[in-house]
Amino acid sequence: KIKGKKVNGKQMRTSTIERITNETKVNLVLNLDGVGRGKIKTNIPFFDHMLEQLTFHSSVDLELNARGDIDIDFHHSVEDCGICLGKAFMEALGDKKGINRYGFFLLPMDDALIRVALDFSGRSFLSWKVNFPSTRVGNFDLELVREFFNAFSTNSGATLHVEMLDGFNSHHISEAIFKAMGKSIKMAVAINKDVEIIPSTKGLSLIHISEPTRL
């Protein structure tokens, strides 16, 4: 069943996640039926900027506070944020009844052209066809962008394809990826009011919310 409280008679699709390890502490609150409002602090400015883009363009509301061993590097913090965001989507989507399930977007940003396709199927898979011209933007290691989306895919039970079609500016490429992901999420999690069923022909009758619902 959809998790969350009712507001004005409407069931809100929400999730609260806390993850504490020896390397990080992440607190996250997600509302799928938001307005694109983000309150994000990871102490990694470029990553914060990317998550703000994803939040705004997906129209979800996201509060995320992360503290990690960024004095060593950003890997643990970025990956754990992906883990928590993925788990939050899995929980907030519940049995996925009535959602579009699929989302896709082709997004241009100056020189960059990015295509993202997403399926909240319950089957985790990431296809990543991105070549950043540089290895870093400022002090942010760009290989962590893939790590973030891999963690998200694994923990949300999503099939995700990300493809770079053009681009020469690494900042633009990364930002276009997060924006296109946001647009794809917005499409996929939207409720189709004409179809009040689980979006699958498998005929699911028993759902365990602790695991991704495979469609």
List the model feature ranges, each with a label.
Residues 9-206:
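Structural preference for solvent-exposed beta-strand-turn elements
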Residues 1-2, 6:
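Polybasic, lysine-rich low-complexity intrinsically disordered segments
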Residues 207-215:
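Conserved small/polar residues in nucleotide/adenosyl-binding loops
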